[in-house]
């Protein structure tokens, strides 16, 4: 993750989350500082009264919203920064000198010298529930102060996160007021303050209620008094008070006023709801054991609100559960429970308070209800602020004797139990809200606590459901399409015992074709793309992992754009951003154009997103245009501004983003122009509306909006009387709705809807002009129940609210508000499902389906920062995929592709690499890490290089070792803290990653020290450290093979500085520049351990042992029934998988494992059933015992039958290809089948088998074509591939099509075989197969691209080595190599008859391979032909070089020439060859020189009898002649002389090989020729003469003729 995402996550994660909160950039005001709940009385509020804390470097100001105010007193404050100063005696705890910091809040303590001495917050960033410091009381330093911050979302935090990140232990900071430096003492005030203990907002079931609290700084004689609802309350000496209030049914507002000399100085209101309908018939109380029996025999008592009733969703109550409820009760994690036995003794307390501290929350806990006893459960919304959970946690101890009271009298628990016996309960297995894609749903669960099942009945919507004696039930329930509300009720003898309701959205026939949309946020990603290649590689990786569409953020929140052609608005380009965490984009690269270019190449949809009503970043102080348009800025009405309406950036309460007014016509027009300039200048597929909303409920209250609201009201006969009070006002910090509040919600929502209508009109107009569809979509928060606060109804106008949806404010949903739904203006919608569990995501997805009424495709937006752990990510992804049209992944900077790719495919992620870090003090050991260049995951050790981002993002409680580009440790933050386990002053561990270096980063879960102490003890400043990742070994672990040897292939990625070396079983393996390596391993029967060790600059970083099993009975190959499938969208079929053994084959369909490599196109389940999801092509694979088979699936929308691949003429796809030259492959049988298997070396091999009938028809269709090519493709990236063709059919058809070309291609290259050439070597009779193989030998991959690895042969020079091309015929399971159809010494005179037309033979060289020797042209008279190759993306024609050089080109670019037979023996002039002429000695020497690839000498030879212009002059000059100065050229070479000359050239060739650094490693065919083919080049056997006779092999004195020896054999090399 980028630094931005660590330091300021709200700038990356779409700020839809802000709709859940009201951020509090507080400024000191009269209301917020004193008048609510006591505290300081400031001067009149204004800009000059701002109170803020300045960071150490003076660059960051944190505004303070509350000063010496009990923020937990009613009304409880949220989204604040609060200041508590020494001596003020006002805190939010029971102690006047300590501030209560609850878990999930942040705080700092500053001493009297302005130095930060303590920081409290998360132990990991981004924080999770388990990575926060526990609840605690933070002492206020003498003469200093404490700052406390609270908000509800870390991702968009403007209080907690800035306080935690900008103020560090040891920093010297300063406190300011009105621009002047102040100190804690400046905020002291002698006036008393009010500290209410009684919580506001509670619901009670008793009319008798007590308000309690304390007057701080109280003293007698001050003229201080206090009233509760107008009645004066008695004040104790310490200012404490209690006042009884009689409640009425419904909501009660209790006024508490503090007066001085009769003048009100502080007031507060406590809101309490009295629910008389749900109260017990009598007052039921529990009484704890006496605190001090010498003082009072009675203990503290508390009312019990519910007896044997489900209290889920009910705040602030104590409930009693008896045996009537059941045998046990489940206590939620943050509740408190007390177990009491039949003798009224406490036997267990769940989440007790130890020594007055906040409980260490555990659970959920299943707690037994003792026979004859009971369980008390307390739950509330604030442990510190409400005395409910705290009551049970504090006053109840194991062994205490307690009492139950009814109307004041002690009673046994049985007196509180019902008379009907045990109460039956129903528990459901179903989620409370979910989406169903079938026409029915399965309801299942259990009825518990039944004393007599015959008296129990279960119904769903009134229909009886059967259940078993054990209470279990399972039934299928038919659903209506759309929303279904299901009410399940359990009755006992007709009386309701329990009920549950379900909300199910039914989408029968819902498309299973899923899109995966990747969001590329501007702020987090723009500067990473410095070149077009960066974009291409990024998108290619995304596509390979299942992404189908991209959303590119072209207008960020700051107002800068990611495109260059801002022809209508003149918006500045993103490279103009100055904020360090975002700056650095390439000013010369049009990012949008690059994204479009490569998206088109890869077949990805490209949509562009706009932060519509966002025009600046308050957090980063970046405003592209807003400072020039202050009238655009939102005017807000916040409680913190003391009743004033202010410009957003002048308000005491600010968010991270500066919004503009959606009601301003100039604003709207400018945003539309921004969209239009992109649509006119760029080829995009759609527009995404992001932040097309108001900032929050406080906006917009400008005069312009007021006038438009008045017009809106006038149209419905209403009038605005008081502005803004008719909308709402504030009582303290609590919003009080006015009479026009519902009109206001509707007005704002219709304002946003009208803008989406204008966008729709714009895109439709551009569509008509361009003739191209442009989709409109929106990205919104999934929390629809509160999104009205942002002025947005993103649903359908047909949506209707139901109580069972349990939304907070049902009054919002008026007929007019329903009309404001804008989903019909969209083509699809993305909802931010930022929840972190599958049930939560299911809930909000279903709510989205309900609200949108299924009218447009809906995609679940997943915040990747919340789901980094692989198992959780998989669960969340699948929850989103099952019930929506797909996923939107936010954001690209957060993606860990291996994890995300597995999660998208619903596969368990298995880390396919070993991360290792050297240990300075243990040279033979290493530290094994977990992940590299991914967001830090708790309880793991990671390595982060500068490709990850600017900094690590670790928290202040992590441990890191920072390693620079030289490999030296420069710092180890928190080393001492971890080793001593003293975290009083933690270091900053969000370390900047050195360029060219890396950081070892770790963090344990809270309270665990294992990983942190491991890293802290391992490294110290000055150590030399290296790191690497080893991969490739997984494929070999447990591999069973019958091969004699296996080529082990792996890869090493060095992280940071250094050069790697690898050994495999003790033998050094050649390491290529890209980090790949290979080594041959001998396999013996049984277990064969293979040990791989990696060292970087000599430092050991990795060691891995895998075991390969040698087994003659192992599977040899795995086959699918087809290699390709053509299916209609929605069609399903089952794969059939066969395992082939040495002498048999077995159907393993039921045992194989399956996966789809393109899940958006085709899915496959665990049984092998594949389903076509959407048009396109995809690959499915089956795996069994280490072997894999793949098949290509082509999906169309056609209505014809599927199951075959007719070919497209492009040669694409698995086993694809087609008849060339316009020929079309007929429909019918499968054209090819594809099998993934192993070759004799244990390498992966792809076998493509052609169907005879289809092939014959295709060849027949070639007749008469201008370019008659029959092509086949070997799919995939395996090191070897074979195309198997039915030879009999091929020979028969090629006989009638002599001009046809057979073309076979793979990722390694391509080969073209003329029909006339093949015909000579194909048997005339009998059944056989032609096998055409393209592969890479182990030696090829070892030597390929090694410096100095130049090879020469046949008069040519080759850089590196090349793929092997082999042609065999197979008959009766035996293979026989065809006569040298290889790139050496091949002539077309094989059939004995001339070909009537020129033919071509070419090899297309892939970029990773270096050279090949193509066969000679079969055009008569052609001596050599340029090699056609492809390099760096474009075609290149290579001609033979004129001279040779022993140096390999550093990039591996081939310096090639031909290996034509006719370059070995030239003609005799005038176009003749003179085949019956005898060779002279000089000509024969030249023949050997060329055949052995020896460099010719300069033409000016020293031999006086050799003409300098003779074709053989340079070749002869390579060696001396028999006599000084003379070569005796006219002598006839004898067989003995030829043998002698061969030995001489052989020895010379061996010496020449030594000139090359890798000469000893050259084992491919090129190298075989170079290193002395000697024995096989000798002229043994019978030699046929022109006269037709022959001589025995032993004869040494025969003439050597020109024709036959020209086809010299070469030393045999291992087949491909």
UniProtKB/Swiss-Prot annotation:
Residues 1191-1244, 1372-1455, 1523-1554, 1585-1616 are annotated as: Disordered. Its main location: secreted. Keywords: Cell wall, S-layer, Secreted, Signal. Residues 1-30 form the signal peptide. Residues 1115-1185 form the BIG2 domain. Residues 1406-1416 have a biased composition (Low complexity). One of its GO terms (cellular component) is extracellular region. This is S-layer-related protein. It comes from Niallia circulans.
């Amino acid at each position: 993750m980028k630094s931005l995402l660590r330091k300021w996550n709200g700038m990356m994660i779409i700020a839809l989350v802000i709709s859940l909160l009201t951020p509090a950039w507080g400024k000191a005001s009269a209301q917020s500082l004193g008048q609510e709940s006591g505290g300081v009385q400031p001067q009149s509020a204004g800009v000059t009264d701002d109170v803020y804390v300045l960071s150490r470097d003076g660059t960051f100001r944190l505004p303070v919203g509350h000063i010496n105010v009990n923020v937990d007193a009613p009304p409880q404050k949220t989204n604040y920064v609060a200041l508590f100063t020494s001596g003020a005696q006002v805190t939010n705890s029971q102690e006047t000198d300590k501030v209560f910091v609850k878990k999930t809040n942040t705080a700092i303590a500053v001493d009297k010298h302005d130095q930060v001495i303590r920081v409290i917050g998360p132990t990991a960033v981004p924080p999770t529930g388990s990575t926060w410091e526990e609840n605690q009381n933070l002492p206020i330093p003498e003469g200093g102060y404490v700052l406390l911050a609270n908000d509800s979302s870390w991702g968009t935090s403007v209080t907690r996160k800035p306080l935690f990140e900008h103020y560090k232990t040891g920093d010297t900071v300063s406190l300011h007021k009105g621009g002047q430096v102040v100190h804690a003492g400046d905020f002291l005030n002698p006036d008393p303050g009010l500290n209410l203990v009684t919580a506001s907002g509670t619901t009670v079931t008793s009319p008798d209620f007590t308000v309690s609290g304390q007057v701080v700084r109280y003293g007698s004689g001050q003229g201080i008094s206090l009233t509760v609802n107008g009645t004066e309350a008695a004040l104790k000496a310490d200012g404490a008070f209690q006042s009884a209030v009689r409640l009425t049914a419904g909501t009660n507002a209790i006024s508490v006023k503090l007066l001085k000399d009769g003048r009100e100085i502080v007031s507060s209101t406590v809101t309490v709801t009295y629910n008389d309908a749900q109260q017990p018939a009598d007052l039921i109380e529990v009484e704890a054991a006496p605190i001090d029996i010498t003082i009072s025999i009675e203990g503290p008592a508390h009312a019990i609100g519910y007896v044997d009733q489900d209290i889920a969703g009910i705040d602030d109550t104590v409930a009693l559960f008896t045996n009537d409820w059941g045998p046990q009760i489940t206590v939620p994690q943050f509740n408190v429970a007390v177990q009491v036995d039949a003798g009224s003794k406490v036997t267990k307390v769940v989440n007790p308070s130890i020594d007055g501290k906040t409980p260490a929350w555990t659970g959920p806990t299943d707690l037994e209800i003792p026979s004859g006893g009971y369980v008390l459960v307390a739950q509330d919304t604030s442990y510190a602020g409400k005395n409910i959970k705290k009551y049970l946690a504090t006053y109840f101890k194991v062994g205490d004797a307690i009492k139950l009271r009814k109307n004041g009298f002690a009673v046994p628990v049985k007196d509180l139990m019902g008379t009907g016996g045990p109460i039956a309960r129903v528990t459901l297995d179903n989620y409370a809200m979910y989406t169903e894609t079938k026409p029915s749903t399965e309801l299942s669960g259990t009825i518990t606590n039944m004393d007599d099942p015959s008296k129990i009945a279960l119904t769903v919507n009134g229909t009886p459901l059967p259940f078993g004696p054990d209470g279990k039930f399972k039934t299928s329930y038919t659903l209506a399409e759309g929303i279904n509300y299901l009410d399940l009720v359990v009755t006992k003898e007709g009386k309701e015992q329990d009920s549950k309701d379900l909300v199910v959205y039914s989408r029968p026939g819902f498309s299973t074709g899923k899109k995966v949309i990747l969001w590329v946020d501007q702020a987090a990603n723009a500067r990473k793309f410095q070149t077009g290649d960066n974009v291409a590689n990024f998108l290619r990786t995304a596509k390979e992992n299942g992404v189908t569409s991209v959303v590119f953020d072209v207008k960020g929140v700051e107002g800068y754009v990611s495109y260059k052609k801002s022809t209508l608005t003149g918006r500045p380009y993103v490279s103009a951003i100055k904020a360090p965490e975002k700056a650095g984009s390439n000013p010369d690269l049009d990012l949008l154009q690059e994204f479009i270019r490569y998206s088109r190449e890869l077949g990805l949809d490209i949509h562009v997103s706009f932060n519509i009503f966002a025009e600046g970043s308050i957090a980063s102080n970046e405003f592209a245009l807003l400072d020039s348009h202050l009238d655009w800025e939102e005017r807000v009405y916040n409680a913190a501004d003391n009743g004033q309406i202010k410009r957003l950036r002048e308000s005491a309460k600010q968010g991270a983003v500066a919004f503009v007014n959606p009601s301003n016509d100039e604003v709207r027009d400018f945003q539309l122009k921004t969209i239009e300039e992109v649509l006119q200048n760029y080829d995009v597929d759609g527009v995404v509306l992001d932040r097309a909303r108001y900032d929050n409920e406080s906006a917009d209250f400008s005069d312009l909006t007021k006038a438009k609201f008045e017009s809106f009201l006038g149209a419905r006969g209403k009038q605005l009387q008081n502005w803004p009070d008719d909308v709402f006002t504030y009582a303290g910090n609590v919003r009080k709705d006015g009479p026009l509040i519902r009109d206001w919600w509707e007005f704002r929502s219709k304002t946003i809807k009208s803008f989406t209508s204008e966008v729709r009109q714009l895109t439709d107009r551009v569509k008509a002009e361009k003739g191209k569809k442009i989709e409109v979509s929106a990205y919104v928060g999934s929390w629809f129940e509160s999104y009205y606060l942002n002025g947005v109804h993103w649903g359908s106008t047909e949506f209707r609210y139901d109580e069972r949806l349990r939304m907070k404010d049902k009054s919002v949903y008026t007929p007019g508000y329903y009309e404001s739904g804008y989903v019909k203006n969209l083509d699809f919608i993305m909802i931010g499902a930022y929840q972190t569990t599958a049930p939560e995501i299911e809930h909000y997805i279903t709510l989205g389906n309900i609200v949108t009424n299924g009218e447009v495709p809906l995609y679940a937006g997943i915040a990747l920062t919340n789901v980094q752990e692989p198992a959780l990510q998989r669960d969340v992804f699948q929850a989103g995929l099952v019930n929506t049209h797909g996923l939107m992944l936010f954001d690209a900077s957060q993606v860990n592709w291996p994890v995300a790719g597995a999660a998208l495919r619903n596969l368990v992620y298995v880390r396919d690499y070993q991360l290792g870090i050297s240990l300075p003090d243990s040279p033979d050991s290493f530290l094994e890490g977990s992940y590299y260049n991914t967001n830090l995951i708790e309880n793991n050790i990671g390595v982060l290089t500068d490709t990850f981002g600017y900094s690590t993002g670790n928290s202040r409680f992590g441990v890191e070792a920072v390693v620079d580009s030289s490999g030296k440790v420069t710092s180890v933050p928190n080393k001492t803290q971890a080793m001593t386990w003293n975290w009083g002053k933690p270091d900053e561990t969000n370390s900047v990653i050195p360029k060219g270096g890396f950081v070892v980063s770790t963090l344990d879960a809270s309270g665990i020290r294992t990983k942190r102490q491991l890293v802290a003890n391992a490294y110290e400043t000055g150590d030399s450290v290296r790191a690497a990742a080893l991969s490739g070994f997984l494929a070999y672990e447990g591999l069973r093979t019958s091969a004699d040897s296996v080529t082990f292939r792996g890869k090493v990625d060095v992280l940071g500085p250094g050069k790697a070396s690898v050994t495999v079983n003790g033998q050094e393996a050649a390491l290529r520049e890209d980090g790949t390596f290979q080594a041959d391993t001998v396999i013996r029967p049984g277990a064969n351990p293979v040990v791989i060790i990696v060292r970087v600059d000599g430092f050991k970083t990795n060691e891995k042992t895998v075991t390969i099993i040698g087994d003659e009975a192992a599977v040899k190959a795995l086959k699918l029934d087809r290699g390709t499938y053509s299916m209609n969208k929605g069609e399903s079929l089952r794969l059939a998988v066969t395992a082939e053994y040495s002498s048999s084959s077995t159907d393993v369909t039921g045992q194989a494992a399956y996966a789809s490599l393109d899940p958006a196109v085709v899915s496959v389940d665990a049984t092998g059933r594949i389903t076509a999801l959407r048009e396109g092509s995809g690959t499915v694979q089956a795996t069994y015992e280490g072997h894999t088979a793949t098949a290509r699936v082509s999906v169309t929308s056609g209505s014809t039958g599927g199951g075959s691949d007719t070919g497209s003429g492009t040669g694409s796809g698995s086993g694809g290809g087609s008849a060339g030259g316009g020929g079309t492959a007929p429909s019918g049988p499968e054209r090819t089948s594809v099998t993934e298997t192993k070759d004799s070396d244990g390498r992966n091999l792809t076998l493509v088998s052609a169907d005879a009938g289809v092939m014959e028809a295709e060849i027949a269709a070639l007749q008469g074509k201008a370019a008659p090519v029959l092509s086949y493709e070997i799919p995939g990236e395996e090191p070897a591939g074979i195309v198997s063709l039915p030879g009999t059919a091929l020979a028969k058809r090629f006989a009638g099509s002599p001009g046809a070309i057979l073309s076979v291609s793979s990722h390694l290259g391509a080969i073209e075989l003329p029909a006339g050439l093949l015909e000579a070597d194909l048997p005339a009779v009998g059944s056989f197969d032609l096998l055409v193989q393209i592969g890479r030998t182990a030696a090829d991959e070892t030597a390929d691209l090694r410096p100095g690895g130049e090879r020469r042969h046949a008069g040519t020079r080759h850089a590196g080595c090349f793929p092997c091309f082999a042609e065999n015929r197979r008959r009766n399971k035996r293979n026989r190599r065809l006569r040298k159809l290889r790139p050496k010494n091949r002539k077309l005179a094989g059939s004995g008859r001339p070909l009537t037309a020129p033919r071509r033979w070419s090899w297309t060289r892939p970029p990773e391979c270096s050279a090949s020797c193509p066969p000679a042209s079969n055009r008569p008279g052609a001596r050599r032909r340029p090699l056609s190759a492809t390099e760096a993306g474009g075609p290149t024609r290579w001609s033979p070089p004129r001279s040779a050089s022993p140096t390999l080109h550093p990039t591996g670019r081939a310096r090639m020439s031909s290996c034509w037979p006719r370059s070995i023996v030239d003609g005799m002039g005038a176009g003749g060859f003179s085949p019956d002429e005898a060779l002279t000695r000089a000509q024969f020497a030249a023949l050997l020189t060329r055949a052995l690839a020896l460099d010719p000498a300069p033409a000016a030879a020293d031999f006086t009898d050799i003409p300098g212009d003779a074709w053989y002059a340079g070749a002869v000059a390579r060696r001396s002649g028999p006599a000084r100065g003379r070569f005796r050229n006219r002598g006839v070479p004898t067989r003995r002389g030829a043998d002698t000359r061969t030995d001489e050239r052989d020895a010379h060739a061996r010496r020449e090989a030594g000139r090359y650094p890798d000469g000893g490693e050259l084992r491919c065919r090129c190298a075989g020729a170079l290193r002395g083919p000697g024995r096989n080049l000798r002229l043994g056997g019978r030699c046929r003469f022109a006269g037709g006779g022959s001589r025995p092999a032993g004869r040494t004195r025969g003439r050597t003729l020109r024709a036959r020896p020209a086809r010299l054999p070469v030393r045999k090399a291992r087949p491909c």
